[in-house]
Amino acid sequence: MLASTRHIARGDTGNVSVRIRRVTTTRAGGVSAPPFDTFNLGDHVGDDPAAVAANRARLAAAIGLPGNRVVWMNQVHGDRVELVDQPRNTALDDTDGLVTATPRLALAVVTADCVPVLMADARAGIAAAVHAGRAGAQRGVVVRALEVMLSLGAQVRDISALLGPAVSGRNYEVPAAMADEVEAALPGSRTTTAAGTPGVDLRAGIACQLRDLGVESIDVDPRCTVADPTLFSHRRDAPTGRFASLVWME
C-alpha cells in the first residue's frame, strides 16, 4: 500500500454538475525494482508484470476506485481516440486518447516525457485523457479527443485542460528540420534548448492549438520530466518506467 497520497498530486476543476478529479503520480511509492523503481505504471517497458499490476492496484486504491474502473491504453503514438462508458479489465489496444461521460471511470495516460493532456467539461459531465507525444500531437490526437467531447455535448467554453509533466523545450533537442516539421503542424512548439540548439516545446504548441480551438482554461504543470528526478524520463534514463496521469468525474 502507499504510505500516503503524498506521492500523488491532486487538482480539482469545476463543480457545476460533476466534480473533476485529476491525478499525476511520481516514481515513488511502488514495488518495481530498478531501473523501473518504484511506482512504474507502464506494462510495456520490460518491468515484471506482477509489479506493474501491484502498482496499478495501489493507484486504484489510493484514488478510491476499483481496479476495473481505471481504464488504460496500449499507446502507439497515433491519433486514435476511443469512447469508453463502462469498466474494463483490459487495456484498449492501439489507442492514444480516451473520452467518457461516465462518472467514476478514470482515464489513464502513461508517460515518461510525452505530454499527458487531461480535459474535462464539468457542466456537461465529459472528460478526456490524451497521450500526446511528438508524433501523436503532429497527427492531431488532441484535436480528435476534443472533437469526440464536442460530439457528446461538451462546449468549448466550458472545457478545462491540464497539460501534465513532460520534457520541456529547454531539454528537448531535435534536428532543425524536425523542429520545423513539428512547428508546421503545431505552431508555437519550435524553441531553443538550454544549449542553444533547435528544440521542441510540445506543451507550448498544444496550448496554442487548444486556444485556437476556443479552449480558454488551460493549466500547465511546470515540471520537466528530464530535470525532475521524482518523475520518470525516457530521454534521461532509458530503460525506465512510466508515471500516470488520470482524470475522472465524481
Swiss-Prot record:
Query: In which domain of life is the source organism classified?
Result: Bacteria
The residues the record assigns to binding Zn(2+) are H77, C114, H131
Q: Which reaction does it catalyse?
A: adenosine + phosphate = alpha-D-ribose 1-phosphate + adenine; S-methyl-5'-thioadenosine + phosphate = 5-(methylsulfanyl)-alpha-D-ribose 1-phosphate + adenine; inosine + phosphate = alpha-D-ribose 1-phosphate + hypoxanthine; adenosine + H2O + H(+) = inosine + NH4(+)
* The UniProt record lists the keyword Hydrolase: yes
Any one GO CC term of this protein is: peptidoglycan-based cell wall
Q: Cell membrane as a keyword?
A: no
Q: Which Gene3D superfamilies match?
A: CNF1/YfiH-like putative cysteine hydrolases
**Record EC number:** 2.4.2.1, 3.5.4.4, 2.4.2.28
Q: What are its cofactors?
A: Cu(2+); Zn(2+)
Select a single GO molecular function from the record's annotations and give it.
S-methyl-5-thioadenosine phosphorylase activity
Q: What keywords were assigned to this record?
A: Copper, Hydrolase, Metal-binding, Oxidoreductase, Transferase, Zinc
Its annotated function is as follows: Purine nucleoside enzyme that catalyzes the phosphorolysis of adenosine and inosine nucleosides, yielding D-ribose 1-phosphate and the respective free bases, adenine and hypoxanthine. Also catalyzes the phosphorolysis of S-methyl-5'-thioadenosine into adenine and S-methyl-5-thio-alpha-D-ribose 1-phosphate. Also has adenosine deaminase activity.
Family according to the record: Belongs to the purine nucleoside phosphorylase YfiH/LACC1 family.
Q: How does it assemble?
A: Homodimer.
Q: What is this protein called?
A: Purine nucleoside phosphorylase Rv2149c
The upper taxonomy is:
Bacteria, Bacillati, Actinomycetota, Actinomycetes, Mycobacteriales
